[in-house]
Amino acid sequence: MAKHLFTSESVSEGHPDKIADQISDAVLDAILEQDPKARVACETYVKTGMVLVGGEITTSAWVDIEEITRNTVREIGYVHSDMGFDANSCAVLSAIGKQSPDINQGVDRADPLEQGAGDQGLMFGYATNETDVLMPAPVTYAHRLVQRQAEVRKNGTLPWLRPDAKSQVTFQYDDGKIVGIDAVVLSTQHAEDIDQKSLQEAVMEEIIKPILPTEWLNASTKFFINPTGRFVIGGPMGDCGLTGRKIIVDTYGGMARHGGGAFSGKDPSKVDRSAAYAARYVAKNIVAAGLADRCEIQVSYAIGVAEPTSIMVETFGTEKVPSEQLTLLVREFFDLRPYGLIQMLDLLHPIYKETAAYGHFGREHFPWEKTDKAALLREAAGLK
């Protein structure tokens, strides 16, 4: 492979689309805490002074959607009207219905193992050994930059920062290996009274330098910090936000393919979410086992049917055993039926709000990030 550049982006928890994702997942978590078998499809729209929460929810639980919404916005940091959005005064509207019984009859079964997929669709999972968390470096470091922005905003190190921010990192590759960082973009909302020069210096010292490895930076690395020169108006005042509009940020930063389904606000019966998590789990264990340097899994489903309609393993020529053997190992060691993967990853718990900002993958405490099957896979593949 020749030299090439690859870029990924991330957005902060205060980005309008991420506010929406976090509200949707906060509602999901509150419901799952009371009713693990609930059916939830919760969508959120945010704009200046308003939050609209809608969707289809079937549950025995009762939750206070207005309180959940305000608490989520407050935790993110929108607590003053001068930010253009205020948790204490924004309107919260609810438009919740029930899941269609036509869908429900295809999902629920007397035998849980025969639980059907909540919809048709295709999902991808990916892993690569280019970082310690077996994720692509561009999206990993893009996430870490905006996580650091939130950290120094909340701990008072840079008190003039505001919640909305975006990052973008361009890596240089040579023959598939990282050789450096070519460009870094970081745009952050800020208070009115900070000048551009002071902001750029502080962002470089407190956000960028602590995160990016020095061995990947050189004299030709380009830095773009608030390149428009001003970012006072941000958050929902600057742009409306919608659940499910940052699906590439949520996954692999464009390094792997995407089936198109969003995650946030969906309970685990929705394979858009749960099967994408399972596909990551499979791919990560294959790479952790040393069976390939890079691995992409595709799985697909028919609505109301338990067995996947297809499973595909792609290793981009990096496999250490034949591809056909890898596919057989996946079928042997991973139950990718909807009920099977829910049990395999223990998904019926309120764990989802935390996924809704800074990426669903590459953070070790999530159950789909375990590599507990790596040793079994390696042994079964006949590798020492």
Curated annotation (Swiss-Prot):
UniProt region (Flexible loop), positions on chain: 99-109
Coiled coil segments of this chain: none
Molecular function GO labels: ATP binding; magnesium ion binding; methionine adenosyltransferase activity
Ligand binding (Mg(2+)): 17
Gene3D superfamilies tied to this protein: 3.30.300.10
GO biological process: one-carbon metabolic process; S-adenosylmethionine biosynthetic process
Binding positions for K(+) per the UniProt entry: 43
Pathway annotation: Amino-acid biosynthesis; S-adenosyl-L-methionine biosynthesis; S-adenosyl-L-methionine from L-methionine: step 1/1
Keyword Nucleotide-binding belongs to the record: yes
Residues the record lists as binding L-methionine: 56, 99, 239, 270
Keyword field: ATP-binding, Cytoplasm, Magnesium, Metal-binding, Nucleotide-binding, One-carbon metabolism, Potassium, Transferase
Binding site for ATP: 15, 164-166, 230-231, 239, 245-246, 262, 266
Nucleotide-binding keyword on record: yes
Subcellular location: Cytoplasm
Its EC number(s): 2.5.1.6
Gene Ontology CC entries for this record: cytoplasm
InterPro entries noted in UniProt: ADOMET_SYNTHASE_CS, S-AdoMet_synt_C, S-AdoMet_synt_central, S-AdoMet_synt_N, S-AdoMet_synthetase, S-AdoMet_synthetase_sfam
Annotated family: Belongs to the AdoMet synthase family.
Protein purpose: Catalyzes the formation of S-adenosylmethionine (AdoMet) from methionine and ATP. The overall synthetic reaction is composed of two sequential steps, AdoMet formation and the subsequent tripolyphosphate hydrolysis which occurs prior to release of AdoMet from the enzyme.
Protein name in UniProt: S-adenosylmethionine synthase
Lineage: Bacteria, Pseudomonadati, Pseudomonadota, Gammaproteobacteria, Enterobacterales
